[in-house]
């Protein structure tokens, strides 16, 4: 079974959000079969920092939609967008 790597940009709803705590919450929200392979940050504007989270999901699981939905349901997340996708 092949896997897909995707970089998801997670925007917190405030610049005051603890990014380490948010990263832990994202990790806990992952659907079965998905795993976080790394996280980086990106300064956006006005003190707001986005998390760039690399997620590995099985290719047969319908892509990144389940992960996007799970991340979007986490408290303090304003939005989730797919930045990059590629097969492993």
Curated annotation (Swiss-Prot):
Keywords assigned by UniProt, alphabetized: Elongation factor, Protein biosynthesis
Pfam families according to UniProt: EF1_GNE (PF00736)
Superkingdom assignment: Archaea
Alphabetical list of InterPro entries matching this protein: eEF-1beta-like_sf (IPR036219), EF1B_bsu/dsu_GNE (IPR014038), Transl_elong_EF1B/ribsomal_bS6 (IPR014717), Transl_elong_EF1B_B_arc (IPR004542)
UniProt GO molecular function: translation elongation factor activity
Transmembrane regions: none
CDD domains in the record: EF1B (cd00292)
Known function: Promotes the exchange of GDP for GTP in EF-1-alpha/GDP, thus allowing the regeneration of EF-1-alpha/GTP that could then be used to form the ternary complex EF-1-alpha/GTP/AAtRNA.
Family: Belongs to the EF-1-beta/EF-1-delta family.
Protein name as annotated: Elongation factor 1-beta
Species: Halobacterium salinarum (strain ATCC 700922 / JCM 11081 / NRC-1)
Chain's gene name: ef1b
């Amino acid at each position: 079974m092949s896997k897909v790597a995707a970089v998801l940009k997670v925007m917190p709803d405030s610049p005051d959000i603890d990014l380490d705590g948010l990263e832990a919450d994202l990790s806990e929200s992952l659907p079965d079969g998905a795993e976080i392979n790394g996280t980086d940050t990106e300064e956006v504007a006005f003190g707001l920092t986005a998390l760039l989270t690399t997620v590995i999901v099985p290719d047969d699981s319908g892509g990144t939609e389940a992960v996007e939905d799970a991340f979007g349901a986490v408290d303090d997340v304003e939005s989730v967008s797919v930045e990059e996708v590629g097969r492993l």
